[in-house]
Amino acid sequence: MAHYITFLCMVLVLLLQNSVLAEDGEVRSSCRTAPTDLVFILDGSYSVGPENFEIVKKWLVNITKNFDIGPKFIQVGVVQYSDYPVLEIPLGSYDSGEHLTAAVESILYLGGNTKTGKAIQFALDYLFAKSSRFLTKIAVVLTDGKSQDDVKDAAQAARDSKITLFAIGVGSETEDAELRAIANKPSSTYVFYVEDYIAISKIREVMKQKLCEESVCPTRIPVAARDERGFDILLGLDVNKKVKKRIQLSPKKIKGYEVTSKVDLSELTSNVFPEGLPPSYVFVSTQRFKVKKIWDLWRILTIDGRPQIAVTLNGVDKILLFTTTSVINGSQVVTFANPQVKTLFDEGWHQIRLLVTEQDVTLYIDDQQIENKPLHPVLGILINGQTQIGKYSGKEETVQFDVQKLRIYCDPEQNNRETACEIPGFNGECLNGPSDVGSTPAPCICPPGKPGLQGPKGDPGLPGNPGYPGQPGQDGKPGYQGIAGTPGVPGSPGIQGARGLPGYKGEPGRDGDKGDRGLPGFPGLHGMPGSKGEMGAKGDKGSPGFYGKKGAKGEKGNAGFPGLPGPAGEPGRHGKDGLMGSPGFKGEAGSPGAPGQDGTRGEPGIPGFPGNRGLMGQKGEIGPPGQQGKKGAPGMPGLMGSNGSPGQPGTPGSKGSKGEPGIQGMPGASGLKGEPGATGSPGEPGYMGLPGIQGKKGDKGNQGEKGIQGQKGENGRQGIPGQQGIQGHHGAKGERGEKGEPGVRGAIGSKGESGVDGLMGPAGPKGQPGDPGPQGPPGLDGKPGREFSEQFIRQVCTDVIRAQLPVLLQSGRIRNCDHCLSQHGSPGIPGPPGPIGPEGPRGLPGLPGRDGVPGLVGVPGRPGVRGLKGLPGRNGEKGSQGFGYPGEQGPPGPPGPEGPPGISKEGPPGDPGLPGKDGDHGKPGIQGQPGPPGICDPSLCFSVIARRDPFRKGPNY
């Protein structure tokens, strides 16, 4: 029990630390967390029907899933109405989205007439009026027909109570004037129409955005003739007070601010964006600058200075960066590098506009769309840091620049209405004209002109087409009671319902029988003084308690539970003898104290009956070796732990004997394609042979026995490169070889790391008490504990007692407090052994067990089944060009034709004649016999090898 209380105290300390972090602002603020009272008023009349009402419930579930439900965040209430309103879900009834979803799905359809005004008044009186939270209050009215009572007075009363009203009309039976009377102004923001209930899903995202704007963007920015929800960042950072110098933009009487490096434009984010930002918004800024460095026009930082959202201008690369949060890795950066972005750095006035949605961000410069980039889903922002404008990236130094406008609009549609009229020389459309810094433009009011002259009478028109069928009439009165129907077939059992509300406190139960003696109690605080109790039975001697810190003298009270060990206190004066305290827990070994006085010898107690066998205790700390005890009974086998992480390679074991062939295993998965083998060394030059005829497929050879692996040989000398042989023909595909015998058993691996702790097993039966062992020597001094203040310990233990005492009292371990009395009575007669008590609550997880002994070598596993046929190998490299010897010279040609007879008279020798023409080609000679083996010319071999490049594709010339 003491360990259990200590464990709970440690857990509470950690929870207190975490709660401090949460209170310091470590909560992401967004629409999900903005505190809001949100009430849905649903039409449940006859015209809706059960099927359409189910569609409405699914739509309501999809809307509320976007919010965090709880007392600190959004609370949802639901009212269904027909002839009368019904409170289906009160505000604050559920603290989680799952419970709220289950409650919405369990709402039953009413049916009846349409009394919308009565339902609005009911929500005002019984939901909003009973909410004690001073925050945003929103009501959404969904109806499909004209109300049968007045709605104006009830809606006006709700608006007077600062309740924002949305009206959703479904179908053609709704009246536009009635919906406008219900909703807030302007109706373009607070009134929605859909053609039927199936189409209601089309306005889900728009409705979610509008609800978000109401809860996150409470302020309004004057824009032309209407006020837009959003944030004027210049106003939120008090720029008009911090920056004294104003500048004139143009003759249009538009003024701006000249920011210097001496001004610090920073403010706490919680003051500027108290509830964070909506998921979709429009960022607009108008500025002029000359700086050529990287700086942040606007940024929201965490408490440790990390940017969450930022608009960064890179004057070096002339690009724009947008930083925002991300659910993937916390942050994401989008780069706009379009050539048109460079115009921002020409030292002139320009407007930057970023349309940020949940899917993407779009950049506009001077009212022209530049680029669109996708976004990952975003997170809410942390509001415990600062919001700044005009700072160098990563620094606190202010940039010198001029600024005229810096705003965030919560409505994405404002992107279509925004203009850049404040920029000098802007040629775009300016419907409402520019506005001055800090001024509110007046709406344009134009008086109507004079009536024109009456026109001539027109010709008679053609007969009109037949009209459309008339609209359905109003809901009829309830019909007469019908004849009782036959009993239906028993339905199938329904699904288990949601958990019910806590029941009322029951009547006090009768006094129970006296139970078995309980375990020693846990430490408690000093109680109030009580009346003197009756003489109780003498209790057993308890174990000594911890030495507590000396406390202030208090009033006399009843004996409390033993206290927790406290730090050693200063030596105090000798006080009076106190009352005998309750037995405490065994304390840690302390320093030897002064010899005490001899106490009186106690009376010997009556031997008790042998008790039942106790439960297995928790593992204690390792003490010094004790005396050899008796052999204990074998323990219960533990649960199988999870696989440990792979151990380090073990030392190679001795070669085992050859095992028997294993049983044929299951087919293994197809193996991966192997890497190409290394290129072999060139062989010796071969003879020049003729291409041989492809041989027949050979018979399948027998599987040879596996040889013993030889020792690694020494590296041989590098041989002379051989001549490349001619490329051979592709051989026929060989048959699949037989299965090999199983391999030799591998060496025993080293011991793996300890497995993950197993789950706590069920409590075993109560065992017999063992023989008491000899008392061991005192343990070593423990490490000094962490210092906690006495007030902190009291607070933690008070919380523990409040939370755990009712559970312990109901668990059956403590039936009464007879054993807590401190008076000594006469020893009672030992009672018979009590029955085995009920199974106790599940204990805390046990301490990790010792590392197990390495197991024996397992039996060799079955060999895997032969793998699937591998993919065809790569084509081999083309061989180098072969060479042959020149052929033998052919035989001489036949003699030419006989010339004409010469002159008989001998003349002088003539000049040499011209060379004769080549004779006809002779027939090829007969193939000669192969010559003897040639001798390789080293120069020729080198040239062949040099031409052979294994990485060259194509022939080698």
Curated annotation (Swiss-Prot):
Compositional bias ranges of the Basic and acidic residues kind: 507-517, 732-742
Residues covered by region (Disordered): 448-786, 825-938
Residue intervals of the Laminin G-like domain: 230-412
SUPFAM superfamilies: Concanavalin A-like lectins/glucanases, vWA-like
Tissue expression per record: Highly expressed in lymph node, jejunum, pancreas, stomach, trachea, testis, uterus and placenta; moderately expressed in brain, colon, lung, prostate, spinal cord, salivary gland and vascular smooth-muscle cells and very weakly expressed in heart, liver, kidney, bone marrow, spleen, thymus, skeletal muscle, adrenal gland and peripheral leukocytes. Expression in heart was higher in the right ventricle and atrium than in the left ventricle and atrium.
Source organism superkingdom: Eukaryota
Compositionally biased tracts (Low complexity): 451-462, 471-481, 618-637, 705-729, 839-874
Biased composition (Pro residues): 829-838, 889-900
InterPro entries to which the protein is assigned, alphabetical: Collagen, Collagen_Structural_Proteins, ConA-like_dom_sf, TSPN-like_N, VWF_A, vWFA_dom_sf
Alphabetic keyword roster: Collagen, Cytoplasm, Extracellular matrix, Glycoprotein, Repeat, Secreted, Signal
Glycosylation sites (chain numbering): 62
GO terms for cellular component: collagen trimer; collagen-containing extracellular matrix; cytosol; endoplasmic reticulum lumen; extracellular region
Subcellular location: Secreted, Extracellular space, Extracellular matrix; Cytoplasm
Pfam families membership: Collagen (PF01391), VWA (PF00092)
Chief place where the protein resides: secreted
UniProt similarity note: Belongs to the fibril-associated collagens with interrupted helices (FACIT) family.
Protein name: Collagen alpha-1(XXI) chain
